[in-house]
Protein backbone atom coordinates (compact mmCIF):
# COMPACT_ATOMS: atom_id res chain seq x y z
CA UNK A 1 0.00 0.00 0.00
CA UNK A 2 1.14 3.53 -0.76
CA UNK A 3 1.10 6.10 2.06
CA UNK A 4 1.17 9.57 0.48
CA UNK A 5 1.03 12.77 2.52
CA UNK A 6 2.79 16.07 3.13
CA UNK A 7 4.91 17.96 5.63
CA UNK A 8 2.09 19.65 7.53
CA UNK A 9 2.08 22.49 10.04
CA UNK A 10 2.28 21.86 13.77
CA UNK A 11 1.69 25.51 14.66
CA UNK A 12 -0.21 25.74 17.94
CA UNK A 13 1.07 22.35 19.07
CA UNK A 14 2.14 18.99 17.64
CA UNK A 15 -1.39 17.72 18.26
CA UNK A 16 -2.56 19.85 15.31
CA UNK A 17 -0.39 18.01 12.76
CA UNK A 18 -2.59 14.89 12.41
CA UNK A 19 -5.66 17.12 12.03
CA UNK A 20 -3.96 19.10 9.27
CA UNK A 21 -2.87 15.88 7.56
CA UNK A 22 -6.40 14.43 7.71
CA UNK A 23 -7.88 17.60 6.22
CA UNK A 24 -5.80 17.28 3.03
CA UNK A 25 -6.56 13.58 2.57
CA UNK A 26 -3.08 12.42 3.56
CA UNK A 27 -2.34 8.82 4.52
CA UNK A 28 1.06 9.83 5.94
CA UNK A 29 2.61 13.04 7.19
CA UNK A 30 5.76 14.81 8.30
CA UNK A 31 6.09 17.53 10.92
CA UNK A 32 8.52 19.53 13.01
CA UNK A 33 8.15 18.58 16.68
CA UNK A 34 9.68 21.95 17.70
CA UNK A 35 10.49 25.33 16.17
CA UNK A 36 12.92 24.46 13.38
CA UNK A 37 14.53 27.92 13.41
CA UNK A 38 15.55 27.96 17.08
CA UNK A 39 18.19 26.02 18.97
CA UNK A 40 16.03 25.52 22.04
CA UNK A 41 12.29 25.02 22.45
CA UNK A 42 9.89 24.49 25.31
CA UNK A 43 9.43 20.83 26.33
CA UNK A 44 6.39 19.04 24.96
CA UNK A 45 3.41 19.30 27.30
CA UNK A 46 1.75 16.12 28.55
CA UNK A 47 -1.64 17.13 27.14
CA UNK A 48 -0.10 17.82 23.71
CA UNK A 49 1.54 14.38 23.71
CA UNK A 50 -1.73 12.72 24.72
CA UNK A 51 -3.76 14.59 22.09
CA UNK A 52 -1.20 13.85 19.37
CA UNK A 53 -1.36 10.12 20.05
CA UNK A 54 -5.16 10.18 20.38
CA UNK A 55 -5.64 12.01 17.08
CA UNK A 56 -3.14 9.83 15.22
CA UNK A 57 -5.10 6.79 16.34
CA UNK A 58 -8.44 8.40 15.47
CA UNK A 59 -7.31 9.29 11.95
CA UNK A 60 -5.46 6.03 11.35
CA UNK A 61 -1.89 7.32 11.36
CA UNK A 62 0.43 4.53 12.45
CA UNK A 63 3.92 5.62 13.64
CA UNK A 64 5.33 3.88 10.55
CA UNK A 65 3.71 6.48 8.27
CA UNK A 66 4.86 9.54 10.24
CA UNK A 67 8.27 11.00 9.35
CA UNK A 68 9.22 13.93 11.61
CA UNK A 69 11.99 16.24 10.39
CA UNK A 70 14.64 17.82 12.60
CA UNK A 71 15.68 21.48 12.71
CA UNK A 72 17.52 22.93 9.73
CA UNK A 73 20.04 24.49 12.14
CA UNK A 74 21.50 21.11 13.10
CA UNK A 75 24.82 20.11 11.50
CA UNK A 76 26.00 16.77 12.87
CA UNK A 77 29.28 17.10 10.98
CA UNK A 78 30.08 20.64 12.11
CA UNK A 79 33.87 21.23 12.11
CA UNK A 80 33.49 23.78 14.91
CA UNK A 81 33.44 22.24 18.41
CA UNK A 82 30.84 24.63 19.83
CA UNK A 83 28.55 24.32 16.81
CA UNK A 84 28.91 20.55 16.87
CA UNK A 85 27.90 20.32 20.52
CA UNK A 86 24.88 22.59 19.97
CA UNK A 87 23.86 20.38 17.06
CA UNK A 88 24.27 17.18 19.06
CA UNK A 89 22.29 18.59 21.99
CA UNK A 90 19.48 19.71 19.68
CA UNK A 91 19.45 16.38 17.82
CA UNK A 92 19.16 14.50 21.12
CA UNK A 93 16.23 16.73 22.06
CA UNK A 94 14.58 16.01 18.69
CA UNK A 95 15.06 12.26 19.15
CA UNK A 96 13.69 12.42 22.71
CA UNK A 97 10.59 14.27 21.48
CA UNK A 98 9.98 11.52 18.94
CA UNK A 99 10.24 8.96 21.75
CA UNK A 100 7.71 10.90 23.83
CA UNK A 101 5.27 11.05 20.91
CA UNK A 102 5.55 7.32 20.24
CA UNK A 103 7.19 7.91 16.85
CA UNK A 104 9.68 5.51 15.29
CA UNK A 105 11.73 7.73 12.95
CA UNK A 106 13.54 11.07 12.81
CA UNK A 107 14.51 12.40 9.39
CA UNK A 108 17.54 14.70 9.11
CA UNK A 109 20.03 16.20 6.67
CA UNK A 110 23.39 14.59 7.45
CA UNK A 111 25.62 17.66 7.71
CA UNK A 112 28.14 19.99 6.09
CA UNK A 113 31.92 20.30 6.25
CA UNK A 114 31.70 24.10 5.68
CA UNK A 115 34.92 23.91 3.68
CA UNK A 116 36.91 23.28 6.85
CA UNK A 117 37.51 19.51 6.86
CA UNK A 118 37.92 16.54 4.56
CA UNK A 119 34.76 14.84 3.32
CA UNK A 120 35.51 11.46 4.94
CA UNK A 121 36.35 13.13 8.26
CA UNK A 122 33.02 14.95 8.21
CA UNK A 123 31.11 11.77 7.31
CA UNK A 124 32.75 9.98 10.24
CA UNK A 125 31.81 12.86 12.53
CA UNK A 126 28.19 12.60 11.39
CA UNK A 127 28.20 8.86 12.17
CA UNK A 128 29.75 9.58 15.57
CA UNK A 129 26.98 12.11 16.29
CA UNK A 130 24.36 9.51 15.39
CA UNK A 131 26.03 6.89 17.62
CA UNK A 132 26.13 9.30 20.58
CA UNK A 133 22.42 10.06 20.18
CA UNK A 134 21.28 6.47 19.66
CA UNK A 135 23.15 5.43 22.82
CA UNK A 136 21.03 7.87 24.86
CA UNK A 137 17.65 7.00 23.31
CA UNK A 138 15.62 3.96 22.30
CA UNK A 139 13.12 2.93 19.66
CA UNK A 140 13.66 5.77 17.18
CA UNK A 141 15.45 5.25 13.85
CA UNK A 142 17.82 7.98 12.60
CA UNK A 143 16.74 8.48 8.97
CA UNK A 144 19.40 10.10 6.79
CA UNK A 145 18.01 12.24 3.96
CA UNK A 146 19.99 12.49 0.75
CA UNK A 147 20.86 16.06 -0.21
CA UNK A 148 21.22 17.96 -3.48
CA UNK A 149 24.89 18.56 -2.67
CA UNK A 150 24.41 22.31 -2.53
CA UNK A 151 27.36 24.19 -1.05
CA UNK A 152 29.28 21.97 1.37
CA UNK A 153 26.32 19.72 2.20
CA UNK A 154 27.17 16.03 2.27
CA UNK A 155 24.98 12.99 1.69
CA UNK A 156 24.35 13.69 -1.99
CA UNK A 157 25.89 10.45 -3.24
CA UNK A 158 24.74 6.99 -2.27
CA UNK A 159 28.37 6.22 -1.41
CA UNK A 160 28.45 9.02 1.19
CA UNK A 161 25.25 7.73 2.78
CA UNK A 162 26.64 4.18 2.83
CA UNK A 163 29.84 5.49 4.46
CA UNK A 164 27.81 6.97 7.33
CA UNK A 165 25.67 3.85 7.75
CA UNK A 166 28.78 1.67 7.80
CA UNK A 167 30.07 3.58 10.84
CA UNK A 168 26.75 3.57 12.74
CA UNK A 169 26.97 0.89 15.41
CA UNK A 170 23.27 -0.04 15.67
CA UNK A 171 22.27 -0.80 12.08
CA UNK A 172 18.69 -1.50 13.19
CA UNK A 173 18.26 2.18 14.06
CA UNK A 174 19.59 3.88 10.95
CA UNK A 175 17.75 4.35 7.67
CA UNK A 176 17.44 6.52 4.58
CA UNK A 177 14.90 8.94 3.11
CA UNK A 178 15.30 9.73 -0.59
CA UNK A 179 14.13 13.13 -1.82
CA UNK A 180 13.34 13.02 -5.54
CA UNK A 181 14.36 16.65 -6.19
CA UNK A 182 17.63 16.15 -4.30
CA UNK A 183 18.29 12.90 -6.16
CA UNK A 184 17.91 14.59 -9.55
CA UNK A 185 19.96 17.63 -8.54
CA UNK A 186 22.73 15.38 -7.24
CA UNK A 187 23.11 13.85 -10.70
CA UNK A 188 20.93 10.73 -10.62
CA UNK A 189 18.64 10.52 -13.64
CA UNK A 190 15.23 9.42 -12.39
CA UNK A 191 13.27 11.06 -15.23
CA UNK A 192 13.46 8.21 -17.74
CA UNK A 193 12.56 4.54 -17.21
CA UNK A 194 16.15 3.55 -17.97
CA UNK A 195 17.62 6.15 -15.63
CA UNK A 196 15.11 5.33 -12.90
CA UNK A 197 15.93 1.62 -13.10
CA UNK A 198 19.68 2.25 -13.04
CA UNK A 199 19.50 4.77 -10.17
CA UNK A 200 17.62 2.41 -7.89
CA UNK A 201 19.71 -0.59 -8.94
CA UNK A 202 22.74 1.46 -7.88
CA UNK A 203 21.04 2.54 -4.64
CA UNK A 204 20.26 -1.07 -3.78
CA UNK A 205 23.83 -2.13 -4.55
CA UNK A 206 25.53 0.66 -2.58
CA UNK A 207 23.10 1.31 0.29
CA UNK A 208 20.39 -1.35 0.12
CA UNK A 209 16.60 -1.08 -0.06
CA UNK A 210 16.45 -2.62 3.41
CA UNK A 211 17.51 0.81 4.74
CA UNK A 212 14.87 2.83 2.86
CA UNK A 213 12.35 4.22 5.37
CA UNK A 214 10.57 6.89 3.33
CA UNK A 215 10.67 9.35 0.45
CA UNK A 216 10.10 13.04 -0.15
CA UNK A 217 8.16 13.47 -3.39
CA UNK A 218 9.12 16.78 -4.97
CA UNK A 219 9.42 17.90 -8.56
CA UNK A 220 12.48 20.06 -9.29
CA UNK A 221 12.98 23.59 -10.61
CA UNK A 222 16.61 22.74 -11.37
CA UNK A 223 18.04 20.32 -13.88
CA UNK A 224 19.83 16.99 -13.53
CA UNK A 225 23.18 17.42 -11.77
CA UNK A 226 22.62 21.10 -10.89
CA UNK A 227 23.52 20.52 -7.22
CA UNK A 228 20.86 23.15 -6.41
CA UNK A 229 17.93 22.36 -4.08
CA UNK A 230 14.72 23.91 -5.46
CA UNK A 231 11.43 22.06 -5.11
CA UNK A 232 8.50 22.40 -7.52
CA UNK A 233 4.90 21.18 -7.50
CA UNK A 234 4.30 17.67 -8.86
CA UNK A 235 4.28 17.62 -12.67
CA UNK A 236 5.18 21.31 -12.93
CA UNK A 237 8.96 20.99 -12.77
CA UNK A 238 11.71 19.45 -14.85
CA UNK A 239 11.02 15.92 -13.64
CA UNK A 240 7.57 15.42 -15.10
CA UNK A 241 4.83 13.10 -13.94
CA UNK A 242 6.48 9.90 -15.20
CA UNK A 243 8.96 9.79 -12.30
CA UNK A 244 6.14 9.85 -9.77
CA UNK A 245 4.09 7.28 -11.69
CA UNK A 246 7.10 4.93 -11.61
CA UNK A 247 7.40 5.39 -7.83
CA UNK A 248 3.69 4.87 -7.23
CA UNK A 249 3.51 1.59 -9.18
CA UNK A 250 6.79 0.20 -7.79
CA UNK A 251 6.20 -2.12 -4.78
CA UNK A 252 9.67 -1.28 -3.41
CA UNK A 253 8.15 2.00 -2.22
CA UNK A 254 5.14 0.42 -0.49
CA UNK A 255 4.43 0.71 3.24
CA UNK A 256 6.51 3.81 3.92
CA UNK A 257 5.73 7.55 4.16
CA UNK A 258 5.85 9.32 0.78
CA UNK A 259 5.89 12.97 1.76
CA UNK A 260 5.23 16.06 -0.34
CA UNK A 261 7.39 19.11 0.39
CA UNK A 262 6.19 20.99 -2.67
CA UNK A 263 6.00 24.80 -2.48
CA UNK A 264 2.25 25.44 -2.91
CA UNK A 265 0.48 23.99 0.14
CA UNK A 266 -2.91 24.80 -1.39
CA UNK A 267 -2.20 22.16 -4.05
CA UNK A 268 -1.44 19.34 -1.61
CA UNK A 269 -4.93 17.74 -1.67
CA UNK A 270 -4.86 17.85 -5.48
CA UNK A 271 -1.29 16.52 -5.63
CA UNK A 272 -2.11 13.63 -3.28
CA UNK A 273 -5.05 12.66 -5.49
CA UNK A 274 -2.90 13.03 -8.61
CA UNK A 275 -0.32 10.64 -7.18
CA UNK A 276 -2.94 8.04 -6.25
CA UNK A 277 -4.39 8.30 -9.78
CA UNK A 278 -1.04 7.07 -11.10
CA UNK A 279 -1.85 3.67 -9.61
CA UNK A 280 -4.70 3.35 -12.11
CA UNK A 281 -2.91 4.73 -15.17
From Swiss-Prot:
Q: Which residues bind Zn(2+) 3?
A: 182, 229, 231
Binding note for cofactor: Binds 3 Zn(2+) ions.
- What UniProt keywords apply to this chain's record, in alphabetical order? DNA damage, DNA repair, Endonuclease, Hydrolase, Metal-binding, Nuclease, Zinc
Q: EC number(s) per UniProt?
A: 3.1.21.2
What Gene Ontology molecular-function terms does this entry list? deoxyribonuclease IV (phage-T4-induced) activity; DNA binding; DNA-(apurinic or apyrimidinic site) endonuclease activity; phosphoric diester hydrolase activity; zinc ion binding
Essential cofactor(s): Zn(2+)
Instruction: Give me the residues that bind Zn(2+) 1, please.
Output: 69, 109, 145
Instruction: Enumerate the transmembrane spans.
Output: none
Coiled coil residues, start to end: none
Disulphide bridges: none
Mention one GO biological process in which this protein takes part, according to its record.
base-excision repair
Q: What class of enzyme is it?
A: hydrolase
Record's superkingdom? Bacteria
In its keyword annotation, does this UniProt entry include Membrane?
A: no
Reactions catalysed: Endonucleolytic cleavage to 5'-phosphooligonucleotide end-products
Q: Name one Pfam family in it.
A: AP_endonuc_2
Residues that coordinate or bind Zn(2+) 2: 145, 179, 216, 261
Task: Report if keyword DNA repair is assigned.
Answer: yes
Functional note: Endonuclease IV plays a role in DNA repair. It cleaves phosphodiester bonds at apurinic or apyrimidinic (AP) sites, generating a 3'-hydroxyl group and a 5'-terminal sugar phosphate.
Family (UniProt): Belongs to the AP endonuclease 2 family.
Looking up NCBIfam families in the UniProt record yields: nfo, PRK01060.1-4
Name used for this protein in its record: Probable endonuclease 4
User: Organism, per UniProt?
Assistant: Parabacteroides distasonis (strain ATCC 8503 / DSM 20701 / CIP 104284 / JCM 5825 / NCTC 11152)
Amino acid sequence: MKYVGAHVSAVGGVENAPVNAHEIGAKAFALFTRNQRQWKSQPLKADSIHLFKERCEAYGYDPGCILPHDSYLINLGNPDAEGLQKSRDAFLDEMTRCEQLGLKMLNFHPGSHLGKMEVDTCLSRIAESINITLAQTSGVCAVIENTAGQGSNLGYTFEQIAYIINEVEDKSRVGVCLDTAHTLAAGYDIKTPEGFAETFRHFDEVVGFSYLRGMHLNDSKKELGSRVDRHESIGKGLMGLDTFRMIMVDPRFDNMPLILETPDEALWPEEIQLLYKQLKS
